[in-house]
């Protein structure tokens, strides 16, 4: 279990309060699919993902980005037990979707980039450190179903 200080929880809540789930989710998932094109194989039902314009204009990418960030938001509401909270999602990604767990880290990394671009100078090294701790917690919880 991860220990969160009151300050860390406040930082996460502050950053999350500035997140536009629909737009930032779309931006993060689009960036993942463009920067790591091999991840597109998990989204074959999304249609054309052949270039940046196709990815960024794809309504299924936008909807799934929203779904992903909604899950992050839900996990944030359960910081003291993220692993249990994400157990079902971990299991489905491992057993049904066969997603390489390294892709959770990649998505977490692109989300940091999206948030840093959005928040600018407010995304301080201290904020990034807390967000990286959150990402590590989320990635570990999502990867748990694989081991």
From Swiss-Prot:
GO cellular component entries: hemoglobin complex
Heme in keyword set: yes
Keywords, ordered alphabetically: Heme, Iron, Metal-binding, Oxygen transport, Transport
Domain Globin: residue ranges: 3-147
Protein's UniProt keywords contain DNA damage: no
Tissue: Red blood cells.
PROSITE patterns for this protein: GLOBIN (PS01033)
Domain of life: Eukaryota
Residues the entry annotates as binding heme b: 64, 93
Transmembrane segments: none
Alphabetized GO MF terms: heme binding; metal ion binding; oxygen binding; oxygen carrier activity
The family this protein is said to belong to: Belongs to the globin family.
Subunit description: Heterotetramer of two alpha chains and two beta chains.
Primary role: This is a larval (tadpole) beta-globin.
Protein name (record): Hemoglobin subunit beta-2
Protein encoded by which gene: hbb2
